[in-house]
Amino acid sequence: MIKIDFAGGVLKNRQELDMRILDILHENAEHLGVSYESTDIPGKLGTLIRKAMAKYGQRAVVLVDEYDKPILDNIDNPPIASEMREGLKNLYSVLKQQDANIQFIFMTGVTKFSKVSLFSGLNQLTDITISRDFST
């Protein structure tokens, strides 16, 4: 499982977001016992997914906790919120690209998918917010 968690702390700019993402990817690589040579975020995530699948013989499961928090933390500053949206799109676009290597993706957040333009590449999202099958 690859876990991407934005729940902790407040990210104030794109540089902080990118650093957090790089830290998260590094932690996942260590946990899964894989390495990568890529230097950019999409390359690192793509390689992490592929190498995890190759090592464990199973397609990856990706958990994204609070997928929209970096945007919502900056909602009162539209230019920064826009930078955060672009940074997250840079990350999430890899998930569509790696579809063949991913079993499923589970995302939590506050905003409805259709209200956030992060997922133009992901066309198979299912909102289970009010589904009885997933209630506790």
Regions inferred by a protein language model and the residue ranges of each:
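Phosphate-binding site recognition
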Residues: 1-136
